[in-house]
């Protein structure tokens, strides 16, 4: 978003990959020091869903990779979470802090809330998730939040670009698109460091087998010796494949440096910012920082 007036700061330092655009800010990390006026592109449907603070219970948790945990949350029996694919929730912690995670399931599949939580060494909350979390633990959340959602009224082909656990909101978006019968061409590029970081490798392959309009292209930045697929930066792989990226709707989720680099590269190749939609997130700083 753009900061129009007021003052704020980033308590953990400027986020990596923060755009150089004048007065740009990441509202998920900024702490206001005065009243703020901001400019943001809002989606009407997302604005119509009022976020709620509610309890939830950990139904199950399982490791998907060496540093990714899938956590399934269950709301009270009488409640269901109304949300749009791609939105996120925040855990309300006892120390007053919050931790945000994207919702990985689609709205039609709402028996549980699925999260993919990456372990950050020294991060208080993720240490708790990986070392101490037990099923049936009761937590408090606020949801749904965010405007990173599908523009279903568009007729343009779609590119989905995920970095690491940025796959989570993209998963929800794609499962919603398949369920809704969207027939536009859809391509997912999933950029990770090594093969083991593709923490649900079979799922996109299943999507390809079931949907003729979907393609999946994994990209490794530090490939294994036996890797024969794509390598390098994920946005470079996209630009090598796509002849005219200006014709696409592009959805990006992952670390700010990835989203910023991709956005700048795509704009240089003719894609208007009006057709770029992103969820850039940074992992919480370790204790003491």
Task: For each feature predicted by the language model, list its residue ranges.
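Short, structured interface segments
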Residues: 25-48, 137-139
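Short, conserved phosphate/pyrophosphate- and ester-handling motifs at nucleotide-, phospho-/glycolipid
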Residues: 86, 166, 255
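Ferredoxin-reductase
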Residues: 50-138, 155-156, 192-194, 219-223
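A short, basic/flexible loop-to-alpha-helix module at the beginning of a structural domain
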Residues: 143-155
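Short, surface-exposed secondary-structure boundary micro-motifs
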Residues: 4, 41-43, 94, 144
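Phosphate- and divalent-cation-binding pockets in alpha/beta enzyme and binding domains
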Residues: 149, 169-172, 199, 261-262
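Reductase modules of NAD(P)H-dependent flavoproteins
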Residues: 1-36, 185-289
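Histidine-anchored nucleotide/phosphate-binding helix
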Residues: 171-179
């Amino acid at each position: 978003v753009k900061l129009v007036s007021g003052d704020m700061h980033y308590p953990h330092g400027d986020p990596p990959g923060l755009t150089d655009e004048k007065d740009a800010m990441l509202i998920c990390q900024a702490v206001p020091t005065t009243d703020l006026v901001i400019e943001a592109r809002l989606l009407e449907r997302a604005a119509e869903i009022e976020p709620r603070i509610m309890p939830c219970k950990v139904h199950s948790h399982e490791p998907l990779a060496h540093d990714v945990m899938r956590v399934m949350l269950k709301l009270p029996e009488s409640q269901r979470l109304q949300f749009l694919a791609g939105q996120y929730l925040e855990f309300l912690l006892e120390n007053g802090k919050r931790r945000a995670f994207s919702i990985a399931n689609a709205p039609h599949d709402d028996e549980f809330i699925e999260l993919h939580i990456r372990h950050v060494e020294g991060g208080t909350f993720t240490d708790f998730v990986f070392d101490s979390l037990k099923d049936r633990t009761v937590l408090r959340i606020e949801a749904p939040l965010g405007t990173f959602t599908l523009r279903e009224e568009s007729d343009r082909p779609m590119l989905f670009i995920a970095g690491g656990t940025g796959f989570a909101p993209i998963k929800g978006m794609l499962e919603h698109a398949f369920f809704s019968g969207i027939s536009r061409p859809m391509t997912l590029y999933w950029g990770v460091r090594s093969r083991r970081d593709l923490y649900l490798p079979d799922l996109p392959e299943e999507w390809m087998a079931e949907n003729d309009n979907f393609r999946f292209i994994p990209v490794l930045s530090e490939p294994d010796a036996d890797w024969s697929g794509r390598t390098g930066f994920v946005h470079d792989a996209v630009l090598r494949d796509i002849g005219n990226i200006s014709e696409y709707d592009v959805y990006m989720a992952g670390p700010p440096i990835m989203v910023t680099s991709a956005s700048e590269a795509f704009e240089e190749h003719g894609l208007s910012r009006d057709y770029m939609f992103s969820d850039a997130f940074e992992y919480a700083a370790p204790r003491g920082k």
